[in-house]
């Protein structure tokens, strides 16, 4: 029997059907349903600090179940979430309807060929670009969707992601892409798309994990606490020294 061809876009479209009711429930209630809730809140909290306050518009590409879009809409932004999976969009719309008055809409579509019909202040890729079939097309589409001077934020897994056990499992079980997507590579894509400048930053969640540690709660000795805190600062400085390998990239149109 021939092995069917690998079609990651079909895998993305079928993903929410394959994960079952429990998986969809988990996706609906992110970030709070996820073991990495602290990571997500640290990253999105930093995003809110960096963005200009509402009213501003955001295009959330590869929004999945819509939790990032809804989070930003609850903070007052006008958000359009786009995902290739109609199941994901239905889930996002169902969740958004539970909070009347949100300025959020969801559209099914391919972010490699997005036609939003208007321009946005910000574009966000949150754990989404590394699933692309053609990441250059996706970044170029994001560029075209921005207003002059608009800003793209990308929180993506860095080097080595494609080799970890979770990524390999997702490829095997769901037939999706799980690519390495370090900020330095995203900048290569961005330059070709037309972005004029960039900033590499450590992922806020990485810095938080370095400095705010459970180890503090396990040993109340003052000397030990000071040592752990010092090591935490050193780890944070190490992360800050190499954000082009793994972290956040910001690019300006």
Region spans (language model):
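A short glycine-rich, Lys/Arg-flanked "PGG" loop and its adjoining helix->strand segment in the class I
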Residues: 136-148
């Amino acid at each position: 029997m021939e092995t069917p061809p690998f079609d990651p876009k079909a895998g993305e479209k079928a993903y929410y059907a394959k994960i079952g009711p429990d998986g969809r429930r988990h996706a609906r209630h992110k970030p709070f349903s996820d073991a990495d809730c602290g990571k997500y809140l640290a990253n999105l909290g930093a995003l809110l600090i960096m963005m200009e306050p509402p009213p501003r518009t955001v295009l959330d590409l590869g929004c999945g179940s819509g939790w990032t879009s809804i989070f930003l809409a609850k903070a007052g932004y006008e958000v359009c979430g786009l995902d290739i999976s109609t199941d994901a969009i239905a889930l996002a719309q169902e969740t958004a309807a539970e909070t009347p008055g949100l300025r959020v809409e969801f559209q099914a579509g391919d972010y490699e060929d997005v036609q939003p019909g208007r321009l946005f202040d910000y574009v966000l890729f949150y754990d989404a670009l590394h699933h692309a079939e053609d990441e250059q097309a996706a970044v170029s589409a994001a560029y075209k969707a921005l207003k002059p001077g608009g800003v793209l934020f990308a929180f993506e897994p860095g080097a080595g992601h494609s080799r970890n056990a979770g990524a390999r499992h997702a490829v095997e079980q769901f037939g999706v892409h799980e690519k390495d997507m370090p900020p330095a590579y995203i900048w290569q894509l961005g330059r070709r798309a037309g972005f004029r400048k960039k900033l590499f930053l450590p992922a806020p969640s990485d810095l938080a994990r370095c400095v705010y540690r459970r180890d503090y709660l396990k040993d109340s000795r003052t000397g030990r606490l000071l040592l752990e805190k010092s090591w935490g600062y050193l780890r944070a400085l190490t992360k800050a020294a190499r954000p082009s390998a793994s972290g956040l990239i910001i690019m300006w149109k």
